[in-house]
């Protein structure tokens, strides 16, 4: 841990009642308890900033930087006044889909909601019971919690913990006269989308899947066991015809997003232009408030579900699209929420660096490991990279054509 790191989670010992609830509920055993004194402290090396301990503390002795109780309540109040919406949709980072997907998920559950307040969180299990009642007091009539399926929770026990809280909250709300539909839980886990008509049966996805979710078939295209798929994106990278992709992170959609951003910013004579590919678990603020990057550093953030889903083709293509530098931000091996198959991602980066070196572009790409436990770490590394790229001349490359072997057809 960096000595200059400002911890995102702290226990206020003056408020702590030594009840040890946080110690017993932490899914990462990141809270140490002294058996003699009962004093509890957070081990920042193990903490994943899921916030479950924060929401469980009965005396609010735990301070947290991201998505604190007052901040969440203020956000709901502001959005309610701005949109007039009476529906609050809570989403875990692991399953928080694009806007269109939210509506699709709700419709599949028989819920038709045209206007809602989206609230994205590191884990749905961190929602305090008090916040549910606060949201209702602020004018919310319906709360929908889109949670990961139990076995796919990125914070181990987060979904189970939240399910228990929701059950207790619903029981209490009904006793107070609220409708049974006031609080609803929807289970959703991001998976791959498989278009078998595009598949040529090369079976690359079978060999690359670190979770054994894809099985080769003797006289047919591979079979995906969706009950095992975790949506890491490793298979999507090796598919030569984009027959298999992670829902919400389709290759062409990502390509269009950064290409159009580069075109717009170039027209405004912005320099330098920085593109950040960011694992959704390594950094919170940049992804949940992407406008801050554009305003402060002229940087665009593109979210990826995991380090394994960082496509080297996108790095090369983004430089051809007009960006002066590309920065990748991922979790360390110890912090990765999807640890299986990390060696594949590292090999991809080695190949990428070799290609960039041959193109004399290696200095315009950096890979950093970052954790949300250390406040400001991402901004520090972005500043360093920004200054480095700013010291170079603007990058002027010919726009890559479709025949380029690096570009997927």
What are the residue ranges of the model-derived segments?
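Gly-rich Lys/Arg/Thr-decorated short loops/hinges at beta-loop-alpha junctions or inter-strand turns
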Residues: 1-6, 111-117, 147, 216, ...
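Mobile, glycine- and charge-enriched loop segments
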Residues: 82-125, 266-308, 399
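Peripheral docking tails and interdomain loops at the edges
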Residues: 175-191, 197, 358-406
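A short, flexible N-terminal coil/short beta segment enriched in small residues
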Residues: 36-38, 62-94, 249-281
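Short Fe-S-cluster ligation motifs
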Residues: 50-61, 84-86, 229-245, 263-268, ...
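Cofactor-cradling patches in redox/metallo enzymes
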Residues: 119-173, 303-378
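Local cysteine-cluster metal-coordination motifs and their immediate loop/turn environment
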Residues: 17-28, 45-59, 143, 148-157, ...
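Ferredoxin-like iron-sulfur electron-transfer modules
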Residues: 1-18, 29-49, 67-77, 182-208, ...
């Amino acid at each position: 841990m960096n000595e200059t790191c400002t911890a995102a989670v702290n226990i206020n010992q003056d408020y702590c009642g030594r009840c040890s609830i946080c110690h017993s509920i932490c899914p990462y055993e990141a809270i140490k308890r002294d058996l003699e004194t009962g004093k509890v402290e957070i081990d920042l090396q193990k903490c994943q900033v899921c916030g479950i301990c924060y929401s469980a503390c009965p005396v609010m002795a735990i301070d947290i930087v991201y998505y604190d109780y007052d901040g969440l309540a203020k956000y709901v109040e502001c959005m309610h006044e701005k949109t007039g919406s009476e529906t609050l949709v809570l989403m875990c980072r692991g399953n928080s889909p694009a806007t269109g997907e939210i509506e699709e998920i709700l419709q599949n559950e028989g819920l038709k909601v045209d206007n809602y307040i989206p609230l994205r969180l590191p884990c749905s299990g961190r929602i305090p019971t008090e916040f549910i009642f606060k949201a209702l007091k602020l004018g919310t009539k319906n709360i929908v919690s889109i949670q990961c399926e139990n076995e796919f929770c990125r914070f181990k026990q987060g979904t189970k913990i939240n399910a228990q809280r929701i059950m207790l909250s619903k029981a209490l709300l009904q006793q107070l006269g609220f409708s049974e539909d006031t609080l609803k839980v929807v289970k959703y886990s991001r998976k791959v989308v498989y278009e078998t008509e595009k598949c040529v049966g090369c079976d690359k996805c079978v060999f690359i899947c670190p979770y054994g979710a894809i099985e080769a078939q003797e006289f047919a295209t591979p079979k995906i066991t969706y009950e095992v798929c975790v949506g890491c994106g490793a298979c999507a990278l090796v598919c030569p015809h984009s027959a298999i992709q992670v829902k919400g992170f389709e290759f062409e959609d990502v390509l269009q997003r950064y290409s159009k951003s580069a075109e717009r910013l170039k027209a405004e004579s912005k320099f330098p232009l920085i593109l950040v590919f960011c694992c959704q678990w390594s950094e919170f603020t940049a992804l949940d408030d992407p406008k801050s990057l554009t305003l402060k550093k002229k940087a665009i953030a593109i979210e990826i579900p995991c380090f394994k889903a960082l496509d080297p083709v996108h790095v090369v293509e983004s430089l051809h699209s007009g960006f002066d530098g590309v920065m990748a931000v991922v979790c360390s091996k110890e912090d990765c929420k999807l640890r299986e198959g990390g060696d594949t991602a590292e090999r991809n980066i080695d190949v990428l660096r070799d290609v960039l070196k041959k193109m004399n572009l290696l200095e315009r790409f950096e890979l950093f490991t970052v954790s949300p436990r250390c406040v400001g770490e991402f901004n520090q590394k972005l500043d360093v990279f920004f200054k480095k790229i700013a010291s170079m001349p603007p990058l002027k490359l010919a726009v890559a054509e479709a025949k380029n072997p690096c570009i997927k057809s």
